[in-house]
Amino acid sequence: MQRIIDREIEKTIDMKRLGQLVPPYCVVRQYDNIRGKTLKAVMGKYTVLILLWNIHDKRHRTLDKPGHFFVISTRGPEPCVVFSSTGMTPKKELFITQSDPTLLERILPKGTVYNNKKLQINRNSNTCWRFAILYAHLAPMGLKKFQSLFTHPSVHLSNS
């Protein structure tokens, strides 16, 4: 059973297939290819946007390595949410991927809420797309409720 789980965890996904697995209010794009001066211009008619950060070298050339999917949502109770399964700030992830940080700085509105809970517990980079699909479908519930789905309740045992 563990072999099956390990094999499934290793599976990657391409952007076309990912786009087929998300709700109609969601679109999947490459971070490097989005254009627009505002979040509304970038998202168009969609309320959830899954973006792929490609990995770059220090000269900002795209490398042939798996990237990282993250989500921007205006669909839930919060005005705008940036969700990454790593729980890292976009600034840190952009530094790791060597992607252009000015794009997010330019389009994200004030008051944007960021996921700071680490949900991707293994070091496998192929896990993020699964969380992106989940968040895309469940974005209407909001970030806090989504995070609570992955929080273990504390159990207290007593012998009285």
What are these regions (language model features)?
Residues Q30, N115, Y135-S160:
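Contiguous terminal or domain-adjacent regions
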Residues L39-K40, P101-E105, S158-S160:
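Short amphipathic alpha-helical segments and helix-helix/interface helices
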Residues T47-K144:
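Cysteine protease-like catalytic core of ubiquitin/ubiquitin-like
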